[in-house]
Amino acid sequence: MISMGISRIYLVILFGVLLRCSLRFSVYHQMIAKRVEVSSPFNAWIRAKEGVFLLNIGIDPYDGNTFHESPLFLHFYRFLIEILEEYQLFFVFVLADILTALVFSKVVLKQSKSIVAIDARRLKLKDSNDPTCANLLIKPESTSSNAESIIWIYLLCPYAILPCVAQSTSVFTNLLVAMIFLAATNNHRHLSLFLLSLITLNTFYLILLLPSICLILEHNTQHRNSDRKFRSIIYSLFIFIISLISLIGISILFEKGSLKFIDSVYVFRWTVSDLTPNIGVFWYFFSEIFDHFRSFFIWIFQINFFIYIIPLTMRLKENPYFLSFITLVNHSIFKPYPTVSDLILFLCLLPQWSHLFRCKS
């Protein structure tokens, strides 16, 4: 049975690679890469190449409205472009997609054991004879099939295939998110928080994951004393802040002391300066309102993005894994420049919570 499951995984990986290759080397490649559903000013590969080109000829990529990712990622793209041919670069994106699917699958296998323990503790507080409770619990025999389903969804869903074909840099973002979850689930505190600070450096909206990651780490340590729990969370916050400050310092060194990237990467995104149409609502709203009200509504919309994490954390603190899932849903809905690559992050994790599909209003 195990060998059959592995054979299916190999088959879906092969099929996913073939789908991506058939589209990448077809006449539809350029059309897909230009679609606003797939590429945004913050993840389009054409902008990454332009940024690297400007850097190589001695022009600051952050002077104009060209490149809007952090200097660390800019130099990573430069490294890839310099050592690989164009067709070889594409297979780096394909490999990143495969790794993301496998890592998310591993995360679900590991987390399911903890979720079973959480459910068992919660059952002690309720009537264990209630037959409705058993219907909403994870069945241990379903964890392997759920993990396999995640691989199928991620590798075969158009929301993952199209960004890979377009070589959207969000492919690397999704891989980092998966690695953060894996490191936190395996209780690698320093690694998970460093990776979170790295991804926050590039897209600060993913700082929303900080509460759930801290709670996952605290949950894994199983501190029963409230004082030790508090100190564990504070220590995690300290590691994250120090890592983020260090990465910002390294970025400044890469830019030879210039702070122009702060305006291009963070202020540009916060003020929603590019009103290119996308699948979000920010661009439409801010293209219609009077400039007199623009600053007010920018703050309202941005606060609206972050405010939900407070009640969600308070309500779901006992189940940080579900909190992380809901956080990804919130992130994909309310961020200013969403693409389909944001949607696949939580869609591929739906099988993990398939035991809740029976819930009815």
Over which residues does each language-model region extend?
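Primarily membrane-embedded glycan-assembly and transfer machineries that use lipid-linked glycans
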Residues: 2-179, 190, 214-330, 339
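Hydrophobic alpha-helical membrane segments of integral membrane proteins
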Residues: 172-176, 192-195, 208, 345
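Extended, structured, electrostatic nucleic-acid-contact surfaces
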Residues: 182-197
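Transmembrane-embedded, aromatic-rich helix segments that form part
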Residues: 192-196, 205-219
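Alpha-helical transmembrane segments of secretory-pathway, organelle, and plasma-membrane proteins
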Residues: 347-349, 361
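Aromatic-enriched
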Residues: 354-361
